Amino acid sequence: RSGKLDAFLVLEQLRCNGVLEGIRICRQGFPNRIVFQEFRQRYEILAANAIPKLRNWQWWRLFTK
C-alpha cells in the first residue's frame, strides 16, 4: 500500500544492510571515523604510493572533509 510501512520489512532491510550492526558498534563506544593522518599511518603499507605525503595543511583539509 502506498504511504504504509511494514515495520518488520524495514527492520529486516536495516539488519541485512548492516545498519543495525553499525548502530550497535557505535553504542559500544567504538569510533565510526578516524582522522586522515591515523588512516594514512594505518593503511599506508597497503598502497604506499597511492597516498600522497603532503605536509601542507590545506591539502590535508581536502582529505578530511
Swiss-Prot record:
This is Myosin-11. It holds the Pfam family Myosin_head. It is found in: Melanosome; Cytoplasm, Myofibril. SUPFAM superfamilies: P-loop containing nucleoside triphosphate hydrolases (SSF52540). The lineage of its organism: Eukaryota, Metazoa, Chordata, Craniata, Vertebrata. Muscle contraction. Keywords: Actin-binding, ATP-binding, Coiled coil, Cytoplasm, Motor protein, Muscle protein, Myosin, Nucleotide-binding, Thick filament. Residues 1-65 form the Myosin motor domain. One of its GO terms (molecular function) is ATP binding. Muscle myosin is a hexameric protein that consists of 2 heavy chain subunits (MHC), 2 alkali light chain subunits (MLC) and 2 regulatory light chain subunits (MLC-2). GO terms for cellular component: melanosome; myofibril; myosin complex; myosin filament. The rodlike tail sequence is highly repetitive, showing cycles of a 28-residue repeat pattern composed of 4 heptapeptides, characteristic for alpha-helical coiled coils. InterPro entries: Kinesin_motor_dom_sf, Myosin_head_motor_dom-like, P-loop_NTPase. The keyword DNA damage does not apply. Belongs to the TRAFAC class myosin-kinesin ATPase superfamily. Myosin family.
